[in-house]
Amino acid sequence: TSTEMLKGYVLSKISDGKKRNEINDIWKQQIQLLHGYDKNASQSFFHAWFRGKYAVSIRPGKAGSENQDFELIGTRFHNWFRDSHQALFGLKNSDSFYTFFKEKFPFYVKWYLKCWDARLKFNPNMPHLHYIQYWGIAESLQDPMLLASLNHGDHEEQIVDKIDSVARFIETFTVRRSINYKKFGQT
């Protein structure tokens, strides 16, 4: 899978064996958490994380246009990461790979899964996440928007407010379009 190929690439960039094993253990733990929700959750997570935080381009609607970041992440995100990790992620050496995947990977998995939980079971701190379960747009669009608002290092209260604000926007957007008989699909 793309997730396993990404893991292999990331681990190959960490030269210290002890640090490589630590990231391997973190990776296994995080992927196991994701797969506890759905067998495809790891791929959906990487699509959402990379699109939300690092994609800088999207294919124009013209016929014959080349795929850009958004589409490339959706098809082969491991190749996109390999080609983009220096420019977009700032990962230039073994230590930067280690630090990035030790700190940011678990952070974004945690909040991706908290969003998943709040969509399924009402959370009074993030009520609009539950509402967009019924009035939202495709998860492939809403999940990147939710993660895009987060910054590693934000306080939990800030994060909850940001997520709920984005979910409120999505809900407002879809409800307004719906009651005005306008489409709000993926295209």
Locations of the language-model features?
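Flexible coil/loop and intrinsically disordered segments
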Residues: T1-T187
